[in-house]
Amino acid sequence: MTDIHNHKILILDFGSQYTQLIARRVREVGVFCEIFPHDVAADFIKNYQAKGIILSGGPESVYDSDVKAPEIVFKLGIPVLGICYGMQTMVMQHGGEVKGADQSEFGKAIINILNSTNNIFSNMEHEQLVWMSHSDKVTQTGEHFEIIASSTNAPVAAVAHKSKPFFGVQFHPETTHTENGKQIIENFVVNICGCDTLWNIENIIENDIKEIKQKVGTDKVILGLSGGVDSSVVAAILHQAIGDQLTCIFVDTGLLRLNEGNQVMQVFAEHMDINVIRINAKNRFLDALRGICDPEQKRKIIGKLFVDIFDEEAAKIENAKWLAQGTIYSDVIESAGNNQSKAHVIKSHHNVGGLPKEMKLKLLEPLRELFKDEVRKLGLGLGLPYNMLYRHPFPGPGLGVRILGEIKKEYVETLQKADAIFTEELYKHNLYHDVSQAFGVFLPVKSVGVVGDQRRYEYVIALRAVVSIDFMTATWANLPYDFLSLVSNRIVNEVKQVSRVVYDVTGKPPGTIEWE
């Protein structure tokens, strides 16, 4: 079996908002990498056995901060790439000089490559479009570094050490705005570090299945299946690895999208022949939420009840030794870096679930090394439907945060129908994958309407569609008026409890993507 971790890159995080992008670009090239805080122990760095090290950007100023790269980084004799702050601290630690720029540079810039011989710019054109985001700049490279690229506002746009495989760039090759950023990353990782491209979906599947078999043996495993991307992919890979030793518990809250519960059972229980226990808990959730209007309270009630029901069912499974979870690499990084990270967290996630306290279960997390895009590709490799893997994000509390105020059975059914029409038409008009997220929101207010010759006094549905790269900011989707008119007409005509449809044109900020 191929050892997918044999050649790897270590990324030291100085707090840049782009650090995870660096890791994703390295992996896209086909090389495994991991992110650790910049102040991780020197012995850890020494024993990690990386083929190369990347120093991320960060929000600090080198000349008024004591945040430096660990000296061990430059003593291991392996290649180093410093990005933005990473370049500045590397140059400064080798006798160079960094000062505050007269003018901060944020946005696209043209750099001129001065030297592309056997370095990160090999086989690249003389002029390159890149993405700058910095307030400081290198003013003196010192005796050890030479300038290999420059721009109008950044005379030192890239450097190379004169005798060691150390390179630095003032711009961000990891962003898509840098036209040939992936080529720069590939030149460093493959050509300079000498990494073999072993990190691909086929090898990951083979490696994961072997690891799961070795770890689990003949033990039984329990998985909470939600129908979301992560738990679905965990179910698929565990089933391939251990077959009937896996039992999935699907808690149907009644707050899912229209027919979603049946679709989950169809894919996993019928098509893939996985042992799935479906718990119809709709009434328990409605009872628990009766009279509750506060969004945060609704979230907590839904989350706690979900865990309680899962615990009840899990306790019935005899001799289970493992609890599988859909933890992915982004969760691991956020959990590990909460204290060190300088990047500002804009919003917490709607995660529900937890480890049953009274059960002595060991944790199994087959996806903990993978980013979301890798999880989706893994799912395709395991035979899961494309539309299941590439659906828009859905909050943990489900429609509970898309019904404003109190949740009632009538409200849930009304929203499910309206939301399904919106989604169906997005697919029909090839617009679904042009937007990042689209859904309906139930407003518990009534509005007068006329359908046929009849006066109608019913509820309002708001349609929400946004375009976003990272979901930390978003713009409202400029969907065609004819399309919105069609969706509105269908909802008002087909969903009797709705008399009016409105479209949300609020960006994020100032609004959030979800209404609650």
Swiss-Prot record:
InterPro entries: Class_I_gatase-like, GATASE, GMP_synth_C, GMP_synth_GATase, GMP_synthase, GMPS_ATP_PPase_dom, NAD/GMP_synthase, Rossmann-like_a/b/a_fold. ATP binds at residues 226-232. Residues 199-391 form the GMPS ATP-PPase domain. Its EC number is 6.3.5.2. Keywords: ATP-binding, Glutamine amidotransferase, GMP biosynthesis, Ligase, Nucleotide-binding, Purine biosynthesis. Pfam families: GATase (PF00117), GMP_synt_C (PF00958), NAD_synthase (PF02540). GO terms for cellular component: cytosol. The keyword ATP-binding applies. Pathway: Purine metabolism; GMP biosynthesis; GMP from XMP (L-Gln route): step 1/1. One of its GO terms (molecular function) is ATP binding. Gene3D superfamilies: 3.30.300.10, 3.40.50.880, HUPs (3.40.50.620). It catalyses: XMP + L-glutamine + ATP + H2O = GMP + L-glutamate + AMP + diphosphate + 2 H(+). Homodimer. This is GMP synthase [glutamine-hydrolyzing]. The gene is guaA.
